[in-house]
């Protein structure tokens, strides 16, 4: 299009997988942690889109090119080999994505001005103001009173998949100089922070760990994110502490910036027998443009290891889940280089 200055591709796919091989978790009493088995069938649907454009083509010495790529994938588990509709021990449910979490859904903290606070003793026996409030899915009587306490049946299927993801890159050149910028983005989905999860360190608000500086609930700070220290405990953590580990995984980051200069047709190069010389300076992962997770924690939101690859995580996170936090983060690297052609 536009005399070759605009081009692109679009691909749509449907992929069906049978006899899917996965690691199946076993109870600790079995003596074996897991085994490999064909667990069922999955289906992936999605698209991949690319658009390349030349905005300036040697206009007064200026060249400007840009490229956009976009992709989206929808995964679902269509069948379990056992014939059942779910395997809750392994977080497998027919219909949702195979990599989904099965956990309580945090809706806030309990406060005295909450309409349900009058039912706190029913929903959370022994509970207190300032503790984590999770979604209740049970029945209520005619007056709106809950019929039972919150329990395992209130856990939700939480999809970790993004709505879409992709990248944008651009190149600007002028009289031997060139600047390349590569960015990546992700919209929607959830990431799991091992620092904030139930096996992390930022929600253990007991003992000496109560000295961690987080935004926790007090009578003067009822809009806090973290619960009141000293409430109902689940091990070393506040009850429902795992819900603090889920974050919006959206981000837009600069992945690479490279500035270079090409020494061409230089007499001193010819005398040295050098046909061409290029010098460049590059930086990887220089900064995050926007990210809810980065704004709160200062960490890079790009997940880079699975639960079973993270030595700081011993339980509570499925091995196939991408995590960020106590693993090795994306690093910022600076590189200077010279390319010579003789």
Report the location of each language-model feature:
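Transmembrane beta-barrel architecture of outer-membrane proteins
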Residues: 12-18, 32-33, 41-47, 70-76, ...
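C-terminal beta-signal and terminal closure region of outer-membrane beta-barrel proteins
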Residues: 39-46, 90-115, 216-222, 239, ...
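Membrane-embedded beta-barrel scaffold of Gram-negative outer-membrane proteins
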Residues: 1-31, 64, 71, 75
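Conserved small-residue
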Residues: 37, 43, 56-160, 200, ...
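Outer-membrane beta-barrel proteins
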Residues: 3-4, 16, 51-59, 64-66, ...
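Hydrophobic, lipid-facing positions within transmembrane beta-strands of outer-membrane proteins
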Residues: 45-51, 64-66, 164-170, 177, ...
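Extracytoplasmic gating/loop element in the C-terminal half of outer-membrane beta-barrel translocons
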Residues: 186-278, 282-284
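Transmembrane beta-barrel strands of outer-membrane/channel proteins
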Residues: 8-14, 66-72, 172, 181-185, ...
